[in-house]
From Swiss-Prot:
Span list, region Dehydrogenase ArnADH: 314-660
Keyword terms of this UniProt record: Antibiotic resistance, Lipid A biosynthesis, Lipid biosynthesis, Lipid metabolism, Lipopolysaccharide biosynthesis, Multifunctional enzyme, NAD, Oxidoreductase, Transferase
Keyword field contains Membrane: no
Binding site for (6R)-10-formyltetrahydrofolate: 114, 136-140
Function: Bifunctional enzyme that catalyzes the oxidative decarboxylation of UDP-glucuronic acid (UDP-GlcUA) to UDP-4-keto-arabinose (UDP-Ara4O) and the addition of a formyl group to UDP-4-amino-4-deoxy-L-arabinose (UDP-L-Ara4N) to form UDP-L-4-formamido-arabinose (UDP-L-Ara4FN). The modified arabinose is attached to lipid A and is required for resistance to polymyxin and cationic antimicrobial peptides.
Binding site for NAD(+): 347, 368-369
GO terms of biological process kind: lipid A biosynthetic process; lipopolysaccharide biosynthetic process; response to antibiotic
Name of the protein in its database record: Bifunctional polymyxin resistance protein ArnA
Amino acid sequence: MKAVVFAYHDIGCTGIRALAEAGYEIAAIFTHADNAAENHFFASVARTAAELGVPVYAPEDANHPLWVDRIRGMKPDAIFSFHYRHMLNDDIINSASLGAFNLHASLLPKYRGRAPLNWVLVNGEQETGVTLHRMVKRADAGAIIAQNTVAIADRDDALTLHRKVCAAAGELLAEALPAIKIGEFSEHQQDESQASYVGRRTPEDGRIDWHLPAQRVYNLVRAVTDPWPGAFGYVGTGKFIVWQSKIHYDRAAAKPGTVLSVAPFVVACAEGALEIVTGQSESGVYMQGSQLAQTLGLVAGARLYNHPAAVAKRRTRVLILGVNGFIGNHLTERLLVDDNFEVFGLDIGSDAIGRFIGHERFHFVEGDISIHSEWIEYHIKKCDVVLPLVAIATPIEYTRNPLRVFELDFEENLKIIRDCVKYKKRIIFPSTSEVYGMCTDASFDEDSSNLVVGPINKQRWIYSVSKQLLDRVIWAYGDKEGLRFTLFRPFNWMGPRLDNLNAARIGSSRAITQLILNLVEGSPIKLIDGGRQKRCFTDIHDGIEALFLIIENKQKNCDGQIINIGNPENEASIKQLAEQLLESFERHPLRDRFPPFAGFREVESSTYYGKGYQDVEHRKPSIRNAKQLLNWQPTIAMDKTIDDTLDFFLQSVEPGDAEE
């Protein structure tokens, strides 16, 4: 049987050797180039491939069409992925006659995602394991072929557990690979109700919070100890690293972070105390805890901190223009949850952001971006990140007010972009799924899909083209003048505070708001062209989390990128959306306050939108970039989003409004 392998790290080497021992013909091995910033304590897949005489490649993007064609040309029977860091696209997965298989270092469906080995220790789990499963679109969600459990001892740390997991992987593959080779294996679907997800960990995640119980701090220390970057704390302005620790439950209670003794070096936590057995100062060498306490100049009663004591915290200042809008107000809520951000906002109204007025990290001015240009320029200069969210984005306005769409969406936003260039500020710009237009691809890819629009006399494309031209201008500024930017493309985000019913009354709202108005008023639901158009509906909370990760940009990998943010799993026609909404409406506790359902009515788009309208039959995103760059994927089902959105609007209707 011929296999193509994607592999990295010790588990990658384990998988490759297991394939060779099972008699597989390995046509090629794909791995990652070594990163000089990493601690290379693990074996080299490239060296293993060379020892076996197998061709090895380390492309920056294995999903590129050129590599896909080469892999197809190899005619593999199976694809195997062992600790490879990137998602593989459908073209690669489907290139093998038997399919693609991934070895994941957890007992799926728990701990899907990145760094499960560290996370199980952080969370104090008593067992983990390895899972061989089929590869599907969603990360780590395919049918399970085999699993092997690994017990986690109280004294295990990341390295000892890593070795156990590698051994378990070898045992599992020794049994599973021969069975796959002869086609005698079974598989079962994962229980989605038991699924959990974890994200990539960074060195910053090793920061010790002394206000946690000692058990939690101990778990963190062992989860990130050498050869990982280590858990760390601060004495004054100095940073120190904890490599080994021990829990003490018999110490008298004290304020968290208080040094209880220096020989041994024991620190109070919220529950119990932690002995620092070994550690080092940031610029020092590995040493015993008591020597570390002496080196740091500590005495009993001194305090340790989570941050450098003498350094004032510098929050990231985020400027949101259009802060009262659907995305703006939800994003503000998410940013204010994190103490690292301060929000400055401008909008012509404040009804959706009233809950933030008075918050110490929220600063709002009521104004119009076409008038308050001096205020905007000053705050672009003052802030770190700029999100210009002001735009006319309702389809009926594209044909009803095309010039206003161009003036606001293009001309006013171009001024903001130029100010970001002038003051060298990072801009996160809301592109749109509309830029793909009538693209014929099964799923729309940020880097390869064509952007296809209709003739000039179809004015509905003025929004799409205005946004596309701004995308191109931003890209050019990034290429020629060093503008830091990310373009994000929302795909049909839905949720509470999307538009309002008054906007729906004049036809200037998104589809679901218009449908809810029909139900509230007892008028027929209008299905434009029969409601055949398919869209992928995305919960606002999923979308905002992705946008937050772009702003946070922990890995510094979002600059110069275009990122689709949508939910390919939530694809439905407008008619299906209306039918699901009706079901939710009929079972809602407030149903009896509203008139009877008046039925569906099919309407031609030219009658509803005007002669300049042209529709798109389908619009499905590829979210490969979001998965790779953000370690993000949507999790919220469409029916929950519909329920939440409907409930918000029904709760907002005052008695008597439905009869107006």
